[in-house]
Amino acid sequence: MKKYTKYLPLLLIIPFLAACGSSSPKKSKRTKTRVDYNTKDTNGLDILTGQFSHNIDDIWGSNELLVASKKDYVKYTDKFYTRSHISFEDGQITIETLGDQNHLRNSIIHTLLMGSDPKGIDLFASGDAPISSNPFLAGQVNDQFGRDINNIAIANDFATYLIQNKLQTRRLQNGRTVTYVAIKMVAGHIEVRARQYLPLVRKMAKRYGIEPSLILGIMEVESAFNPYAVSYANAIGLMQVVPRTAGRDIFARKGFDGQPDRAYLYNPSQNIDSGTLYLAILRDEYLEGITNPTAKRYAMISAYNSGAGAVLKVFDYDKYDAIDRINELSPDAVYRILTTAHPSSQARNYLKKVSKAREKYLHIR
């Protein structure tokens, strides 16, 4: 089993705490909404500090704080003695326990059969993820016979096979022994997840006039189509929308006060709507005036990651002069400059990654 190295600071997992509730944006002048969001974060930190981190440190050790991220799902169960980890980027599922094999078996079954709605799974409670009749991982994991794992009978048989044939152990620094199984996802698991969201992507693409391939390319790079995604920047969901920045622009365009909360952005439909609308805002407002569609697309992709202001400053500190400069350049030159001269290495690589990912989805209309 590969050693966990991508551990996030405690504060980074706060955004999941509000995701189990529901929130309806209000078209009003009230400011109470913003106060509520801050209160939720404060309460979330208290819960996290008092329960989650304390339990993990005591049970697994301080160097074993594994938490959810953009492309990783992590769920603790059995009073935090068992955990499941899905790497949506690497296509690897690891389920491990400090308890007995019954706990391991139970976690295997519930992980393989969990649903796709983040509101249905409380990542901070130690209970099992609910079993769904429409498992999110269906088509992404096969059992020892190559069968799709889509019901309890097959999941139970596969769990038995794994425990009898694939069981491994490792020792923690605190001296405890972990028993675990590792499951490889099928080749093309990313594309399988992408297909689950095609109806929503097509709907939002038509609504805002954004090409589906661009939406899908951004979703792949941002979250690898992980509906539970959260990042260090407090970006939420499939398209990694940041509530306090892009979220405010999105709500303003919709005529809502404040910003979307976590529950709003963990809803796949609302998340894809929000991310696609933000692309339209970049196109129609922040980057208005760029005339070449390809050059504008490059600028939109880069701005989705680093902000429109940072993109324009690569060309000139004056917005209008920057747009004039972009219009003087060929699309290839714009791409070259954004991938070499942007001060953020993350932004430079982001444009490359999204452009490459987008190519896989050009056939989708």
Swiss-Prot record:
CDD domains: LT_MltC_MltE. One of its GO terms (cellular component) is cell outer membrane. Belongs to the transglycosylase Slt family. Its main location: membrane. Murein-degrading enzyme. May play a role in recycling of muropeptides during cell elongation and/or cell division. One of its GO terms (molecular function) is peptidoglycan lytic transglycosylase activity. It holds the Pfam family SLT. This is Membrane-bound lytic murein transglycosylase C. It is a lipid-anchor. The gene is mltC. It is found in: Cell outer membrane. The keyword Secreted does not apply. It comes from Actinobacillus pleuropneumoniae serotype 5b (strain L20).
